């Protein structure tokens, strides 16, 4: 029986890539800088002491970081017995965004350039804004700028509630984000607006990767909170992913837990399970692993590392999240049968000690565990697509165009 379980710790980079200079990210190191802050006692808010990740370390995390950067992260045990196979992987795709990273993991790197809204103020073309106002019958709009999602709620949330004008904003990623209050604006109305925005961006040739619905609740600045009803409208991958091939060629099953289905625009997904927060995502993943049959992938994205702690530059929160993940990891490992493989990885970096609020161009960890997986180093991988090619070989689908099987 062939089953693979892929866990993406969204934004969990392990050191800057060789091309980081192109992105202004030389020296970025999500894991290394979190570990350093913890070792110095600078991340004791809600947790305490050196970064404690014994289970990830046994799967090769510290060694993968050493391969990427040349050193073991502060406070982590470089001499621990390694029971998994580990690697550090470079991104072949042109960007450092979520779709690019995920698609490349599934064997389809993004070799074209996404469109971006690069102006920090008045970010969106007037023609696009006018069409959105007209088609969605809006009283206007707010924002039209680059911003952190939580900052812009404090700045414009109250005005949005009074006027009914949606908040439009973007970032260094190829995204068009729309924040609206779940109660005063309405969730269905927000989703409809996002569908219109997706259509206009696609038809207008803007080449924008995602439209993201960012619903929130609360009644005044300071207590607005984003909810778990986020929805991403992505374009489809430019070629069949290994997920699609498993479904088409092997009549397999691909279970999305969290936002995976959104990222792949539902392509190659046979079941969607919604969950919000690390514990809920873990619980849902465990349930699906227990029920998984032959030729099945269970694919989970743990988004909080990126959205709650990476972008918000919350070192202590990120560290606490990693430690929670590590504590629960044995629950996943204990469910593996003879031929199963568990892959822990990431899609990009988001160093919470870095300047700004955006992603960082970093190597990702590739930690592979299973009863028949030979422990040890799988070395430096030139593309995340090596994961997809490995899965193609494992399930016996046709080869992917990019990547080399790791074993």
From Swiss-Prot:
Pathway: Carbohydrate degradation; 2-deoxy-D-ribose 1-phosphate degradation; D-glyceraldehyde 3-phosphate and acetaldehyde from 2-deoxy-alpha-D-ribose 1-phosphate: step 1/2. It is found in: Cytoplasm. GO terms for molecular function: magnesium ion binding; manganese ion binding; phosphopentomutase activity. CDD domains: PPM. Optimum pH is 8. Binds 2 manganese ions. Mn(2+) and Co(2+) are equally good activators. Can also use Ni(2+), with lower efficiency. Its main location: cytoplasm. One of its GO terms (cellular component) is cytosol. It catalyses: 2-deoxy-alpha-D-ribose 1-phosphate = 2-deoxy-D-ribose 5-phosphate; alpha-D-ribose 1-phosphate = D-ribose 5-phosphate. Keywords: Acetylation, Cytoplasm, Isomerase, Manganese, Metal-binding. Mn(2+) 1 binds at residues 10, 347-348. Inhibited by a number of metal ions, including Cu(2+), Cd(2+), Zn(2+), Fe(3+), Ca(2+) or Fe(2+). Is also inhibited approximately 85% by 50 mM sulfate and 95% by 50 mM phosphate. It is an enzyme of class 5 (isomerase). The modification N6-acetyllysine is found at residue 287. Pfam families: Metalloenzyme. Its EC number is 5.4.2.7. InterPro entries: Alkaline_phosphatase_core_sf, DeoB, Metalloenzyme, Phosphopentomutase_DeoB_cap_sf. Its cofactor is Mn(2+); Co(2+). GO terms for biological process: 2-deoxyribose 1-phosphate catabolic process; 5-phosphoribose 1-diphosphate biosynthetic process; deoxyribonucleotide catabolic process; DNA damage response; metabolic compound salvage. Mn(2+) 2 binds at residues 306, 311, 359. Belongs to the phosphopentomutase family. Isomerase that catalyzes the conversion of deoxy-ribose 1-phosphate (dRib-1-P) and ribose 1-phosphate (Rib-1-P) to deoxy-ribose 5-phosphate (dRib-5-P) and ribose 5-phosphate (Rib-5-P), respectively. This is Phosphopentomutase. It comes from Escherichia coli (strain K12).
């Amino acid at each position: 029986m062939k089953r693979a379980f892929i866990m993406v710790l969204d934004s969990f980079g392990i050191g800057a890539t060789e091309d980081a200079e192109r992105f202004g990210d030389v020296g970025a190191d999500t894991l290394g800088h979190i570990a350093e802050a913890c070792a110095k006692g600078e991340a004791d808010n809600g947790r305490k002491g050196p970064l404690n990740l014994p289970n990830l370390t046994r799967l090769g995390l510290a060694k993968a970081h050493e391969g990427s950067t040349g050193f073991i992260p502060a406070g982590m045990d470089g001499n621990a017995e390694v029971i998994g196979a580990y690697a550090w992987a470079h991104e072949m795709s042109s960007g450092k965004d979520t779709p690019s990273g995920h698609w490349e993991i599934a064997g389809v790197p993004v070799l074209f350039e996404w469109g971006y809204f690069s102006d920090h103020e008045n970010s969106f073309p007037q023609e696009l804004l006018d069409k959105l106002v007209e088609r969605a019958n809006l009283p206007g709009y707010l924002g039209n700028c680059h911003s952190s999602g939580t900052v812009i709620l404090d700045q414009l949330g109250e005005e949005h509630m009074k006027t009914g004008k949606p908040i439009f904003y973007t970032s260094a990623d190829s995204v068009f984000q729309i924040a609206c209050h779940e109660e005063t604006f309405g969730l269905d109305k927000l989703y409809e607006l996002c569908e219109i925005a997706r259509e206009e961006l696609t038809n207008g040739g803007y080449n924008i990767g995602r439209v993201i619905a960012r619903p929130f609740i609360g009644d005044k600045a300071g207590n607005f909170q984003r909810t778990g009803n986020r929805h991403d409208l992505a374009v489809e991958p430019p070629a069949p992913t290994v997920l699609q091939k498993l479904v088409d060629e092997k009549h397999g099953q691909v279970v999305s837990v969290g936002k995976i289905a959104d990222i792949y625009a539902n392509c190659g997904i046979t079941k969607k399970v919604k969950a919000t927060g690390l514990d809920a995502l873990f619980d849902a993943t465990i349930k699906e692993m227990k029920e998984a049959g032959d030729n099945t992938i269970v694919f989970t994205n743990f988004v909080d590392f990126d959205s709650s702690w990476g972008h918000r530059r919350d070192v202590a929160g990120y560290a606490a999240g990693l430690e929670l993940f590590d504590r629960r990891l044995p629950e996943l490992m204990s469910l593996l049968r003879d031929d199963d493989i568990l892959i822990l990885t990431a899609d990009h970096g988001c160093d919470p000690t870095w300047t700004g609020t955006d992603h960082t161009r970093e190597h990702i960890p590739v930690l592979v565990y299973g009863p028949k997986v030979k422990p040890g180093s799988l070395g430096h991988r030139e593309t995340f697509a090596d994961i997809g090619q490995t899965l193609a070989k494992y399930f016996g689908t046709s080869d992917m165009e990019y990547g080399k099987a790791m074993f």
